[in-house]
Amino acid sequence: MPMAKNLVELRDVYKIYGEGRESEVRALDGVSLTIGKGEFVAVVGQSGSGKSTMMNVLGCLDIPTRGTYLLGGTDVRELTDKELSHIRNKQIGFIFQQYNLIQSLTVLENVELPLIYQGVNADDRQDMALEALARVGLANRIKHRPVE
């Protein structure tokens, strides 16, 4: 990505679900926002005000219906799925409101999952996951499912 003064820039961004229908929902309605390097930003608002939608757009999980989103000076609409995946993996961190573990996987498999996306080989991946689980006191629960 080219160097840019602003890390994030939204210009007149809309996210419209069911556009043109009677039940159309404008989750984002002309949002403009600039976040510079080193800035901290809190997104607050009432339930249903578009916070999660905006975070999904900012995190490259969703694209705006219209408007411009520049991430580090690059228009995210011009990026391929592979490039967006790389950005999500290497440049954007997510902390979800819910723990979002995959219920069908063991604790160990859930910890290994991001390492798979990073291309870490199976032996190293398991060693790294076991070490991380030991550090947080969960080494004895590696075969458990998240709900156990």
Regions found by a protein language model. Name each.
Residues G67-D75:
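Conserved ABC transporter NBD signature motif
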Residues E83, R145-E148:
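Conserved ABC ATPase signature
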Residues T74-D75, I116, D123-R141:
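Conserved ABC ATPase "signature" region
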Residues Q103-L113:
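Short coil-to-helix segment of the ABC ATPase nucleotide-binding domain corresponding to the Q-loop/switch region
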Residues V44-Q46:
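The feature captures the beta-strand-to-loop junction immediately N-terminal to the Walker
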Residues M3-L7, I16-G30:
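A short, flexible loop at the N-terminus of ABC-type nucleotide-binding domains that lies
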Residues G59:
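Helix-to-loop junction immediately C-terminal to a conserved catalytic motif
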Residues E22-V25, V76-G93, D123:
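ABC ATPase NBD coupling module
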